[in-house]
Regions:
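Short, low-complexity disordered leader/linker segments with a strong preference
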Residues: 1-32, 390-394
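Immediate post-signal peptide segment of exported/extracytoplasmic ligand-binding proteins
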Residues: 21-35, 63-69, 161-166
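Extracytoplasmic "Venus flytrap"
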Residues: 27, 31-53, 75-82, 104-105, ...
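Extracellular/periplasmic periplasmic-binding protein-like sensory domains
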Residues: 234-307, 318-324, 367, 373-394
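Solvent-exposed, acidic/polar segments of extracytosolic/periplasmic ligand-binding ectodomains
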Residues: 31, 335-394
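Periplasmic-binding protein-like
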Residues: 35, 91, 95-104, 124-126, ...
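Extracellular/periplasmic Venus flytrap/periplasmic-binding protein
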Residues: 86, 131-134, 139-240, 275-286
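Beta-alpha junction/loop-to-helix N-cap segments that form part of ligand/metal-binding clefts
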Residues: 30, 45-50, 60, 64-133, ...
Length: 394
Protein backbone atom coordinates (compact mmCIF):
# COMPACT_ATOMS: atom_id res chain seq x y z
CA UNK A 1 0.00 0.00 0.00
CA UNK A 2 2.87 2.35 0.92
CA UNK A 3 4.40 1.68 -2.49
CA UNK A 4 1.12 2.68 -4.16
CA UNK A 5 0.99 5.95 -2.19
CA UNK A 6 4.60 6.63 -3.09
CA UNK A 7 3.91 5.98 -6.77
CA UNK A 8 0.82 8.23 -6.68
CA UNK A 9 2.81 10.99 -5.02
CA UNK A 10 5.56 10.66 -7.61
CA UNK A 11 3.05 10.82 -10.47
CA UNK A 12 1.38 13.86 -8.90
CA UNK A 13 4.75 15.56 -8.53
CA UNK A 14 5.61 14.73 -12.14
CA UNK A 15 2.27 16.15 -13.28
CA UNK A 16 2.88 19.36 -11.34
CA UNK A 17 6.36 19.68 -12.81
CA UNK A 18 5.06 19.08 -16.32
CA UNK A 19 2.39 21.74 -15.82
CA UNK A 20 5.02 24.19 -14.60
CA UNK A 21 7.20 23.49 -17.63
CA UNK A 22 4.22 23.99 -19.95
CA UNK A 23 3.46 27.31 -18.25
CA UNK A 24 7.06 28.42 -18.71
CA UNK A 25 6.93 27.44 -22.37
CA UNK A 26 3.70 29.43 -22.86
CA UNK A 27 5.18 32.53 -21.21
CA UNK A 28 8.16 33.83 -23.23
CA UNK A 29 10.97 35.93 -21.77
CA UNK A 30 10.84 38.45 -24.60
CA UNK A 31 8.29 40.07 -26.90
CA UNK A 32 9.00 40.89 -30.53
CA UNK A 33 7.60 44.14 -31.94
CA UNK A 34 7.73 45.04 -35.62
CA UNK A 35 7.88 48.82 -36.10
CA UNK A 36 7.17 49.91 -39.68
CA UNK A 37 7.16 53.61 -40.57
CA UNK A 38 8.36 55.92 -43.34
CA UNK A 39 12.06 56.63 -42.72
CA UNK A 40 13.14 57.92 -46.15
CA UNK A 41 12.14 60.79 -48.43
CA UNK A 42 10.47 64.09 -47.45
CA UNK A 43 8.04 62.49 -44.92
CA UNK A 44 10.85 60.72 -43.04
CA UNK A 45 10.70 63.24 -40.20
CA UNK A 46 7.29 61.81 -39.25
CA UNK A 47 8.62 58.27 -39.10
CA UNK A 48 11.59 59.39 -37.03
CA UNK A 49 9.27 60.99 -34.47
CA UNK A 50 7.26 57.77 -34.21
CA UNK A 51 10.37 55.61 -33.88
CA UNK A 52 11.84 57.95 -31.26
CA UNK A 53 8.61 58.13 -29.26
CA UNK A 54 8.23 54.36 -29.16
CA UNK A 55 11.89 53.85 -28.25
CA UNK A 56 11.55 56.36 -25.41
CA UNK A 57 8.56 54.47 -24.01
CA UNK A 58 10.58 51.25 -24.00
CA UNK A 59 13.51 53.07 -22.36
CA UNK A 60 11.23 54.49 -19.65
CA UNK A 61 10.02 50.93 -19.02
CA UNK A 62 13.54 49.64 -18.52
CA UNK A 63 13.86 48.02 -21.94
CA UNK A 64 10.85 45.82 -21.26
CA UNK A 65 7.17 45.72 -22.18
CA UNK A 66 4.90 44.10 -19.63
CA UNK A 67 7.95 42.67 -17.91
CA UNK A 68 9.21 40.96 -21.07
CA UNK A 69 12.42 42.01 -22.78
CA UNK A 70 11.42 44.14 -25.79
CA UNK A 71 12.97 43.17 -29.12
CA UNK A 72 11.98 46.02 -31.47
CA UNK A 73 12.59 45.37 -35.18
CA UNK A 74 12.47 48.54 -37.31
CA UNK A 75 11.67 48.72 -41.03
CA UNK A 76 11.26 51.59 -43.52
CA UNK A 77 8.14 51.23 -45.67
CA UNK A 78 9.62 53.78 -48.13
CA UNK A 79 6.05 55.11 -48.56
CA UNK A 80 5.48 52.26 -51.02
CA UNK A 81 2.53 49.92 -50.35
CA UNK A 82 4.16 46.90 -52.01
CA UNK A 83 7.36 47.35 -50.00
CA UNK A 84 5.33 47.69 -46.81
CA UNK A 85 3.36 44.50 -47.51
CA UNK A 86 6.53 42.47 -48.06
CA UNK A 87 8.12 43.76 -44.87
CA UNK A 88 4.99 43.13 -42.82
CA UNK A 89 4.79 39.57 -44.15
CA UNK A 90 8.40 39.09 -43.05
CA UNK A 91 7.53 40.40 -39.59
CA UNK A 92 4.71 37.88 -39.30
CA UNK A 93 6.13 34.80 -41.05
CA UNK A 94 9.87 35.05 -40.42
CA UNK A 95 10.21 37.11 -37.26
CA UNK A 96 6.95 35.94 -35.64
CA UNK A 97 6.29 39.29 -33.97
CA UNK A 98 3.39 39.59 -31.53
CA UNK A 99 2.65 43.24 -32.32
CA UNK A 100 3.19 45.50 -35.32
CA UNK A 101 3.39 49.26 -34.70
CA UNK A 102 2.79 51.61 -37.63
CA UNK A 103 2.41 53.02 -40.18
CA UNK A 104 2.51 56.79 -40.76
CA UNK A 105 0.37 57.02 -43.90
CA UNK A 106 -3.13 55.76 -44.61
CA UNK A 107 -2.35 54.27 -48.02
CA UNK A 108 0.23 52.06 -46.30
CA UNK A 109 -2.29 51.13 -43.60
CA UNK A 110 -4.80 50.04 -46.21
CA UNK A 111 -2.17 47.86 -47.87
CA UNK A 112 -0.88 46.13 -44.73
CA UNK A 113 -4.10 45.64 -42.76
CA UNK A 114 -4.85 42.12 -44.01
CA UNK A 115 -1.32 40.61 -43.91
CA UNK A 116 -0.67 42.26 -40.55
CA UNK A 117 -3.77 41.01 -38.75
CA UNK A 118 -5.21 37.94 -40.48
CA UNK A 119 -3.12 35.43 -38.50
CA UNK A 120 -3.72 36.97 -35.09
CA UNK A 121 -0.93 39.54 -34.89
CA UNK A 122 -2.05 42.84 -33.36
CA UNK A 123 -1.57 46.03 -35.37
CA UNK A 124 -1.22 49.23 -33.33
CA UNK A 125 -1.38 52.45 -35.35
CA UNK A 126 0.38 55.46 -33.82
CA UNK A 127 -0.86 57.69 -36.63
CA UNK A 128 -2.94 56.48 -39.60
CA UNK A 129 -6.63 56.01 -38.80
CA UNK A 130 -8.85 55.86 -41.86
CA UNK A 131 -12.62 56.24 -41.80
CA UNK A 132 -13.21 52.80 -43.32
CA UNK A 133 -11.33 50.96 -40.54
CA UNK A 134 -13.18 53.06 -37.96
CA UNK A 135 -16.50 51.97 -39.45
CA UNK A 136 -17.65 49.15 -41.69
CA UNK A 137 -14.17 47.61 -42.11
CA UNK A 138 -13.21 47.70 -38.42
CA UNK A 139 -10.87 44.93 -37.31
CA UNK A 140 -10.71 43.16 -33.95
CA UNK A 141 -6.90 43.01 -34.09
CA UNK A 142 -6.42 46.69 -34.96
CA UNK A 143 -6.02 49.43 -32.34
CA UNK A 144 -5.35 53.14 -32.84
CA UNK A 145 -3.51 55.40 -30.36
CA UNK A 146 -3.89 58.51 -32.52
CA UNK A 147 -7.30 59.50 -33.91
CA UNK A 148 -9.70 58.90 -36.75
CA UNK A 149 -8.33 60.86 -39.72
CA UNK A 150 -11.22 63.34 -39.86
CA UNK A 151 -11.07 64.47 -36.25
CA UNK A 152 -8.15 66.92 -36.09
CA UNK A 153 -9.49 68.54 -39.24
CA UNK A 154 -12.94 68.85 -37.68
CA UNK A 155 -11.29 71.01 -35.01
CA UNK A 156 -10.40 73.61 -37.65
CA UNK A 157 -13.77 73.33 -39.36
CA UNK A 158 -15.58 74.06 -36.10
CA UNK A 159 -13.19 76.90 -35.26
CA UNK A 160 -13.64 78.45 -38.72
CA UNK A 161 -17.41 78.18 -38.44
CA UNK A 162 -17.53 79.60 -34.91
CA UNK A 163 -15.09 82.45 -35.65
CA UNK A 164 -17.07 83.78 -38.60
CA UNK A 165 -15.03 82.62 -41.60
CA UNK A 166 -17.23 83.04 -44.69
CA UNK A 167 -14.98 81.78 -47.51
CA UNK A 168 -12.35 79.03 -47.28
CA UNK A 169 -9.84 77.50 -49.72
CA UNK A 170 -9.07 73.81 -49.04
CA UNK A 171 -6.03 71.75 -50.07
CA UNK A 172 -4.68 68.27 -49.28
CA UNK A 173 -2.72 65.40 -50.88
CA UNK A 174 -4.61 63.13 -53.25
CA UNK A 175 -4.93 59.99 -51.09
CA UNK A 176 -7.40 58.68 -48.53
CA UNK A 177 -6.15 60.69 -45.56
CA UNK A 178 -6.30 63.85 -47.67
CA UNK A 179 -9.91 63.16 -48.58
CA UNK A 180 -10.74 62.38 -44.95
CA UNK A 181 -9.07 65.67 -43.97
CA UNK A 182 -11.16 67.90 -46.19
CA UNK A 183 -14.33 65.97 -45.41
CA UNK A 184 -13.58 66.43 -41.72
CA UNK A 185 -13.23 70.19 -42.14
CA UNK A 186 -16.48 70.36 -44.10
CA UNK A 187 -18.35 68.37 -41.45
CA UNK A 188 -18.36 71.56 -39.36
CA UNK A 189 -17.63 74.43 -41.75
CA UNK A 190 -20.82 75.47 -43.53
CA UNK A 191 -19.51 78.57 -45.30
CA UNK A 192 -18.44 78.91 -48.94
CA UNK A 193 -15.66 76.55 -50.09
CA UNK A 194 -14.18 78.64 -52.91
CA UNK A 195 -11.93 75.80 -54.11
CA UNK A 196 -10.95 72.28 -53.09
CA UNK A 197 -7.58 71.21 -54.47
CA UNK A 198 -5.87 67.81 -54.27
CA UNK A 199 -2.14 67.72 -55.00
CA UNK A 200 0.20 64.75 -55.58
CA UNK A 201 1.65 63.19 -52.43
CA UNK A 202 5.12 64.70 -51.83
CA UNK A 203 4.57 67.75 -54.08
CA UNK A 204 7.03 70.47 -53.01
CA UNK A 205 6.39 73.41 -55.39
CA UNK A 206 3.14 75.29 -54.76
CA UNK A 207 3.48 78.30 -57.05
CA UNK A 208 0.39 77.32 -59.09
CA UNK A 209 -1.72 76.71 -55.98
CA UNK A 210 -0.58 79.98 -54.37
CA UNK A 211 -1.74 81.86 -57.46
CA UNK A 212 -5.15 80.19 -57.14
CA UNK A 213 -5.34 81.14 -53.48
CA UNK A 214 -4.43 84.77 -54.20
CA UNK A 215 -7.06 84.97 -56.95
CA UNK A 216 -9.77 83.35 -54.79
CA UNK A 217 -9.24 85.83 -51.91
CA UNK A 218 -10.61 83.56 -49.17
CA UNK A 219 -10.95 84.60 -45.52
CA UNK A 220 -9.01 81.48 -44.56
CA UNK A 221 -7.19 78.52 -46.04
CA UNK A 222 -7.33 75.05 -44.59
CA UNK A 223 -4.52 72.69 -45.58
CA UNK A 224 -3.35 69.22 -44.66
CA UNK A 225 0.22 68.89 -45.96
CA UNK A 226 2.30 66.65 -43.67
CA UNK A 227 6.08 66.43 -43.52
CA UNK A 228 8.17 68.05 -46.23
CA UNK A 229 5.05 69.15 -48.08
CA UNK A 230 4.08 71.38 -45.18
CA UNK A 231 7.60 72.74 -44.75
CA UNK A 232 7.69 74.03 -48.31
CA UNK A 233 4.11 75.25 -48.45
CA UNK A 234 4.35 77.30 -45.25
CA UNK A 235 7.55 79.00 -46.42
CA UNK A 236 6.10 79.71 -49.86
CA UNK A 237 2.80 80.98 -48.39
CA UNK A 238 4.69 83.42 -46.16
CA UNK A 239 7.02 84.50 -48.99
CA UNK A 240 4.03 85.15 -51.26
CA UNK A 241 2.78 87.76 -48.80
CA UNK A 242 -0.46 85.92 -48.08
CA UNK A 243 0.06 85.35 -44.35
CA UNK A 244 -1.03 88.89 -43.45
CA UNK A 245 -4.18 88.67 -45.57
CA UNK A 246 -5.52 85.14 -45.06
CA UNK A 247 -6.00 83.15 -41.84
CA UNK A 248 -3.87 79.98 -41.94
CA UNK A 249 -5.67 76.90 -40.61
CA UNK A 250 -4.14 73.44 -40.86
CA UNK A 251 -3.71 70.01 -39.38
CA UNK A 252 -0.38 68.15 -39.32
CA UNK A 253 1.17 70.92 -41.43
CA UNK A 254 2.63 73.11 -38.70
CA UNK A 255 3.73 70.84 -35.88
CA UNK A 256 6.86 69.73 -34.08
CA UNK A 257 7.93 67.56 -37.01
CA UNK A 258 8.00 70.54 -39.39
CA UNK A 259 8.65 73.58 -37.18
CA UNK A 260 12.46 73.14 -36.98
CA UNK A 261 12.51 73.78 -40.75
CA UNK A 262 9.63 76.27 -40.95
CA UNK A 263 10.72 78.39 -37.98
CA UNK A 264 9.46 82.01 -38.04
CA UNK A 265 7.48 81.39 -41.23
CA UNK A 266 4.95 79.40 -39.18
CA UNK A 267 4.55 81.67 -36.15
CA UNK A 268 0.91 82.47 -35.46
CA UNK A 269 -0.44 79.72 -37.73
CA UNK A 270 -3.13 77.43 -36.33
CA UNK A 271 -3.41 73.66 -36.13
CA UNK A 272 -5.71 71.06 -34.61
CA UNK A 273 -4.32 68.33 -32.33
CA UNK A 274 -5.16 65.85 -29.59
CA UNK A 275 -2.10 66.93 -27.54
CA UNK A 276 0.56 69.63 -27.39
CA UNK A 277 3.95 69.80 -25.64
CA UNK A 278 2.63 72.39 -23.16
CA UNK A 279 -0.32 70.24 -22.03
CA UNK A 280 -0.33 70.66 -18.26
CA UNK A 281 0.12 67.22 -16.71
CA UNK A 282 3.15 65.57 -15.06
CA UNK A 283 3.51 62.76 -17.58
CA UNK A 284 3.72 65.22 -20.49
CA UNK A 285 6.32 67.33 -18.67
CA UNK A 286 8.55 64.29 -18.13
CA UNK A 287 8.05 63.01 -21.67
CA UNK A 288 8.90 66.35 -23.30
CA UNK A 289 11.98 66.91 -21.11
CA UNK A 290 13.34 63.40 -21.67
CA UNK A 291 12.58 63.46 -25.42
CA UNK A 292 14.39 66.77 -25.87
CA UNK A 293 17.35 65.45 -23.86
CA UNK A 294 17.53 62.23 -25.89
CA UNK A 295 16.84 63.57 -29.38
CA UNK A 296 17.54 67.32 -29.24
CA UNK A 297 14.12 68.25 -30.62
CA UNK A 298 10.63 69.09 -29.36
CA UNK A 299 8.31 66.05 -29.62
CA UNK A 300 5.06 66.33 -31.54
CA UNK A 301 1.88 64.34 -31.88
CA UNK A 302 3.57 61.56 -33.88
CA UNK A 303 6.07 60.98 -31.07
CA UNK A 304 3.52 61.14 -28.27
CA UNK A 305 1.10 58.76 -30.02
CA UNK A 306 3.94 56.26 -30.51
CA UNK A 307 4.92 56.65 -26.86
CA UNK A 308 1.34 55.85 -25.87
CA UNK A 309 1.43 52.82 -28.21
CA UNK A 310 4.34 51.52 -26.15
CA UNK A 311 2.44 52.10 -22.91
CA UNK A 312 -0.63 50.37 -24.36
CA UNK A 313 1.33 47.25 -25.30
CA UNK A 314 3.06 47.26 -21.91
CA UNK A 315 -0.30 47.43 -20.10
CA UNK A 316 -1.76 44.56 -22.14
CA UNK A 317 1.19 42.22 -21.61
CA UNK A 318 1.12 42.93 -17.87
CA UNK A 319 -2.57 42.08 -17.66
CA UNK A 320 -2.05 38.68 -19.29
CA UNK A 321 1.06 38.08 -17.15
CA UNK A 322 3.26 37.73 -20.21
CA UNK A 323 1.19 34.94 -21.78
CA UNK A 324 0.68 36.06 -25.39
CA UNK A 325 -0.73 32.73 -26.57
CA UNK A 326 -4.33 33.60 -25.63
CA UNK A 327 -5.23 36.12 -28.33
CA UNK A 328 -8.67 36.82 -26.88
CA UNK A 329 -7.15 37.71 -23.52
CA UNK A 330 -4.54 39.97 -25.14
CA UNK A 331 -7.24 41.69 -27.20
CA UNK A 332 -9.34 42.29 -24.10
CA UNK A 333 -6.31 43.69 -22.30
CA UNK A 334 -5.55 46.05 -25.18
CA UNK A 335 -9.15 47.22 -25.26
CA UNK A 336 -9.05 47.99 -21.53
CA UNK A 337 -6.18 50.48 -22.15
CA UNK A 338 -5.10 50.46 -18.51
CA UNK A 339 -2.31 53.07 -18.70
CA UNK A 340 -1.80 56.78 -18.08
CA UNK A 341 -1.81 58.46 -21.49
CA UNK A 342 0.18 61.61 -22.10
CA UNK A 343 -3.08 63.22 -23.24
CA UNK A 344 -4.80 62.51 -19.92
CA UNK A 345 -8.28 61.04 -20.32
CA UNK A 346 -8.22 58.15 -22.80
CA UNK A 347 -10.36 55.15 -23.59
CA UNK A 348 -11.18 53.09 -26.66
CA UNK A 349 -14.51 53.26 -28.40
CA UNK A 350 -16.11 50.02 -29.65
CA UNK A 351 -14.14 50.39 -32.92
CA UNK A 352 -10.78 50.50 -31.06
CA UNK A 353 -10.28 54.20 -31.89
CA UNK A 354 -9.79 56.64 -28.98
CA UNK A 355 -12.38 58.83 -27.32
CA UNK A 356 -10.39 61.94 -26.38
CA UNK A 357 -10.13 65.73 -26.23
CA UNK A 358 -9.04 67.91 -29.17
CA UNK A 359 -7.51 71.38 -29.17
CA UNK A 360 -6.90 74.39 -31.37
CA UNK A 361 -3.14 75.00 -31.20
CA UNK A 362 -1.01 77.95 -32.29
CA UNK A 363 2.66 78.05 -33.29
CA UNK A 364 4.90 79.93 -30.86
CA UNK A 365 8.61 80.51 -30.32
CA UNK A 366 9.84 79.54 -26.86
CA UNK A 367 12.29 81.63 -24.81
CA UNK A 368 15.01 79.06 -25.59
CA UNK A 369 14.54 79.67 -29.33
CA UNK A 370 12.78 76.39 -30.09
CA UNK A 371 9.39 76.29 -31.76
CA UNK A 372 6.31 74.42 -30.57
CA UNK A 373 2.55 74.31 -30.87
CA UNK A 374 0.72 75.56 -27.80
CA UNK A 375 -2.88 75.00 -26.77
CA UNK A 376 -5.06 78.00 -27.60
CA UNK A 377 -8.47 76.49 -26.90
CA UNK A 378 -10.18 73.16 -26.22
CA UNK A 379 -12.59 72.51 -29.11
CA UNK A 380 -13.90 68.99 -28.36
CA UNK A 381 -14.11 67.04 -25.10
CA UNK A 382 -14.35 63.22 -24.96
CA UNK A 383 -14.87 63.27 -28.70
CA UNK A 384 -15.74 60.03 -30.51
CA UNK A 385 -15.50 59.64 -34.26
CA UNK A 386 -18.78 59.39 -36.20
CA UNK A 387 -17.90 56.10 -37.94
CA UNK A 388 -17.98 53.88 -34.84
CA UNK A 389 -21.72 53.34 -35.31
CA UNK A 390 -20.95 51.44 -38.54
CA UNK A 391 -18.51 49.05 -36.82
CA UNK A 392 -19.88 45.59 -35.99
CA UNK A 393 -17.75 45.28 -32.85
CA UNK A 394 -19.48 46.05 -29.57
Amino acid sequence: MNKLFAMAAALAAFGFAATAVEAQEKTPDKVKIGLIVTLSGPPAVLGHQIRNGFELAVAHLGGKLGGLEADVLVQDDELKPDVAVNKVKAFVDRDQVSFIVGPVFSNILQAIMKPATENGTFLISPNAGTSSFAGKDCNANFFVTSYQNNQAHEVLGKYAQDSGVKKAFLMAPNYQAGKDALNGFKNYFKGDVVDEVYVPLNQLDYSAELSKIADAKPDAIFVFLPGGMGVNFVKQFRQAGLADKITFLSAFTVDESTLPAQQDAAIGFFGGQNWAPNLDNPQTKKFVADYEKAYGAVPGTYAFQAYDAGLLIDSAIRQVHGDLSDKDAVRAALKKADFTSLRGAFKFNTNHYPIQDFYLVKVAKRPDGKYETEIAKKIFENYADPYAKDCAMK
